[in-house]
């Protein structure tokens, strides 16, 4: 997991940073932290944004109102001077740091990071992640004198979920997390193989003073933009057959200056320019961050396993189904040229339509009594797409209907595979 209250650096790393970084005195107007060779990404009259190694820190030069999910100093504050995004471990196979994580509570982790940076823990808002800080995305949007800047890291490989998905964990009054599944059936993972690429961290800075409600509205807009990005990329939930809206450990920090000469903005509505800037900046930053961290980009979604994986389509299942429906010769050809099927744009278009129909049926937008006919119609289009022979749609539909009578209809994914096999066979039967 990459959530901040479990993320930690142990004593070995603390010694490493203590030896590497020299202490510096703090000056309120000139933020300092223990970087010996930082890269300054942005510096202006309001803040300095710097990165070194596994740390990204925004040091505020003037008082700011900060809204954050930080486990310590979280919520709304006017006493936070440092905004930190920290990589606490590698995304995969980091056994040592994974074990160190689960031994520290929220306060201990927060204090450890503050000590490494040589800054007061009470002046820091913190986000933790397993994403590579070097893959940090940065986007700024302007309108007249208004500026919105977003820094983001993002990973969704293992932890993507849709709001309301079933969960395994609950917490006691003392905050200890406990599985709500019986021990015999609770999922277990080896920390040697656990994939922790699952946190979206957003750090958003506005150059204008905001009333508290407007700042909270920005958090809403940022969440909406995040969900929109995952929908654009068709990122699947790992807990349900639906498109994800985020991950289980997403975090955010929003900062805006206070006590400025201009009156605070009273609203950050999506109907206002500030709302547009927030939404577009978050969207672009997350698209960039997901590309660099997970190599997820729009073209990545043109892949049958990506499109229908949330419904159970895998390479193994596809090959088994093709072998069932094709002759030995035709199957051998399909197996050797599988990429020409799974990456074909026309076939993926038909698959997207098929997945959307499955969603509509699950959401109750379409009558369940018509499900078989609805899926048969689109499955025939899948055969058309694979074969590139649209005039044979009626023939494809009838063949699929004959083998999928209501009392013996295939599962939706198996019907899709049968349609692919039929299309592949027809492609070469001139």
Each language-model region and where it sits:
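Short stretches within intrinsically disordered, low-complexity N-terminal or propeptide regions
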Residues: 9-10, 21
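Alpha/propeptide regions of enzymes that mature by internal proteolysis
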Residues: 23-430
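Bacterial N-terminal signal peptides that target proteins for export
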Residues: 1-9
